[in-house]
């Protein structure tokens, strides 16, 4: 019996030691994060505003986390491919998404296969950007009221250009048409550049886009601004009224970018990433990069970002239903 008792005690001690080492190893693994490079997925092409802003944030996060943060462009399908890749990645804190508002709000409403987007865990907003509604100067409209009056005098004769069916500027344009009753025809183009060129040529008479791609054309007088969708006037364009000032308070809608992680990511990692984002967004290089893009820095808690996403989806869901918008 004494020998059996000793054997049992020894076995129990070994099990206790194994459990303790497993607990310590797990805790050490969590405490050690990040111990290797982090991948930051960007769903759009290199050189665009989403990519440029992501790279600025990645460099600042690398300083805070003391590990490289490598931007990986997973492009295609209007940002849906990269967003899906991030959502389905391992939730270990080593794959993150620099998400755009359109991919997080409009896409899930329009595309049934984008349900996984709702599982992404918000970390923090990074930036916001207003849209500006513009028209061709030869049309003669300088205000929303003048544009709507012209459109109603010639119903179906004016065109509204967008970057494509289901794009954020398409849906925002539909909100404008619903709010004003302007009888304008939607014409989808293959990207915002083609849509902008169509308005400059006079082929289309209206479009909306975030400010950065339109700065040159606005300053050259090739496009006439009607209003911007931000809550406050843009310091770079102080003469352009806000949506509320133009009589359209319901169009105070901004684009946004932010950091997200796959579902199941440890709350401790999310909290650490959020704190790193707070510091990164306050850094001079990020402020400079965002300023050049016409972005406004917008740190948030995960809960605040989740609210922003939910509100955006609800807004787009209402307009998609009301205007019976379908995409192929």
Where in the sequence are the language-model features?
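Short coil/turn segments
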Residues: 45-47, 101-102, 136-141, 162-167, ...
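An extracytoplasmic/periplasmic, membrane-proximal ligand-sensing/linker region
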Residues: 35-37, 179-180, 267-328
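Short beta-strand->loop
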Residues: 115-125, 161, 183-187, 205-206, ...
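Hinge/capping helix and adjacent helix->loop/strand transition within the periplasmic-binding protein
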Residues: 88-94, 109-194, 243-245, 256-289
């Amino acid at each position: 019996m004494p020998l059996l008792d000793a054997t049992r005690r020894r076995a129990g001690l070994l099990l206790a030691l194994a459990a303790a080492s497993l607990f310590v190893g797990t805790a050490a693994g969590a405490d050690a994060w990040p111990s290797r490079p982090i991948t930051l997925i960007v769903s759009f092409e290199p050189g665009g505003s989403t990519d440029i802003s992501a790279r600025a944030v990645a460099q600042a996060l690398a300083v805070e986390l003391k590990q490289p943060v490598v931007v990986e462009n997973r492009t295609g399908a209007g940002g849906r491919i990269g967003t899906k890749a991030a959502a389905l990645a391992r939730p270990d804190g080593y794959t993150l998404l620099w998400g755009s508002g359109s991919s997080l709000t409009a896409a899930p409403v329009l595309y049934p296969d984008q349900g996984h987007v709702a599982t992404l865990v918000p970390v923090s907003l990074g930036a916001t950007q207003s849209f500006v509604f513009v028209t061709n100067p030869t049309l003669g409209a300088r205000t929303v009221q003048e544009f709507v009056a012209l459109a109603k005098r010639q119903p179906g004769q004016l065109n509204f250009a967008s970057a494509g069916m289901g794009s954020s500027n398409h849906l925002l344009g539909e909100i404008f048409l619903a709010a004003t009753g302007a009888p304008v025809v939607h014409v989808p183009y293959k990207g915002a550049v083609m849509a902008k060129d169509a308005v400059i040529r006079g082929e289309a008479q209206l479009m909306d886009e975030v400010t950065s791609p339109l700065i040159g054309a606005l300053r050259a007088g090739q496009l006439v601004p009607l209003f911007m969708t931000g809550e406050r006037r843009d310091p770079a364009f102080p003469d352009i009224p806000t949506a509320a000032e133009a009589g359209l308070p319901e169009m105070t809608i901004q684009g946004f970018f932010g950091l997200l992680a796959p579902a199941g990511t440890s709350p401790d990692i999310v909290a650490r990433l959020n704190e790193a984002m707070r510091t990164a967004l306050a850094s001079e290089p990020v402020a400079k990069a965002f300023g050049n893009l016409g972005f406004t820095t917008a740190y948030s808690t995960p809960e605040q970002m989740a609210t922003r996403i939910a509100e955006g989806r609800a807004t787009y869901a209402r307009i998609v239903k009301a205007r019976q918008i379908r995409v192929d």
